Amino acid sequence: YHLHLRPGDDVVRQMGGLHKFMHWDGPILTDSGGFQVFSLAGLRKIKEEGVTFASHLDGAKLFISPESCMGIQKNLGSDICMVLDECIPYPCEKQKVIKSVERTLRWAKRCKDEYLRLGLPQRGILSFGIVQGGCYDDIRKRCAESLAELDFPGYAIGGVSVGEPEPQMLEQVEASASGLPFDKPRYVMGVGTPPQLLKMIALGADMFDCVMPTRLARHAVAFTPDGPINLKNAKFAEDSSPLDNETGGYSSKFSRAYIRHLVKANEMLACTLISMHNIRFFQNLMQKAREAIECGNYEQWSAETIARYESSENDK
C-alpha cells in the first residue's frame, strides 16, 4: 500500500526492484495492503472485487484487488509476497468474522492463481496465505486448513495483537498453527515482545515481523536481556555502561549517558543508535532460540530467558 503510493511500485521496478533500490542483499517480505484494510478503516470500502482506499496522502481513490496486489509485489521485486486479506478488528461478532474469513479465502485463491499466472514461482518468489479468524479458535483452524489445501509455499498468522489480551493472542496463534502443514514456514504477523516471541516459537511459529524495535527506539527505549530501559530516565545521566553488555554491535561503543544526552538534545542519532541496538538484540534472541532448539533444551532456555527479562526492576 505505502510503496504503491510513494514512490510508486513502477518507480521501484524501474530502479531494479527493492533490493537495488535500497542496496539490500537479504530477503525481503512485503505485505499486500491487508493490514491497511484494518488500520485505515475510515478511509476504505471492502467489496468482493477488492478494497477501495482514499489515499492518506491526498485523498485520491486507490483500488487494490487480489490480482493487482500480486502485480504490485512483483514490481517491488519481493522475495515473499503476501496475499490480500482482511484483518479483523477486536472484538468482532462471530457471524461477521465468518463472512470476512470466507472472503479472505476466496481472495487467497485469486492471489494464488495470479501468482502462478505471473510466473512468480519460476522467479524463486514465494507467496504466503494468511490465516484470519478473529478471536474464534474454531474459525482460525478451519481457515488454516482451507489455506493448506491451496498449497502455498508458506503461511502467515494474521489478525493477532490487535487489542486482545495476551493469553487470547497465544490461543489464536496455537489454533491457527494447528491447522497448518508442519513442513511449511509459519509467520506470525505484527508481533511482538521478546517473551511473546519465545512463547509463540514454542507453539510452532518460525517467523515474525514487528515495528516494536524501531518504534520504541524513537521513544528512547532500548531492549536488554534484563528488560527494556528508558533512556529518558535521569538515572542514566552518568551511566558509563553500554546499553547492555551482551548484545554488542556498533551501538555498544557508546555509553548510556551519551545516548541519553542525544535523546535529551533531540538528536536524530539517538534514534539511529537505539534502533540498531534493538534490531541486533532481536536478531541475537532469535539466533539463541535456534541454537536452543538444535540443542534440545528450548523449553528450559526460553523459561529462563523470559524469567530474566520479566524480573527486571528497570523503569519502563
What are these regions (language model features)?
Residues 4-5, 89-90, 163-164, 216-217, ...:
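Short secondary-structure capping/turn micro-motifs that flank functional sites
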Residues 31, 73, 129, 147, ...:
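Conserved, mostly hydrophobic/aromatic
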Residues 68, 72, 76, 99, ...:
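A non-catalytic, amphipathic alpha-helix used as a structural packing/dimerization or gating element
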Residues 85-92, 244-316:
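C-terminal extensions of enzymes
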Residues 90-94, 98, 154-160, 268-271:
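Glycine- and acidic
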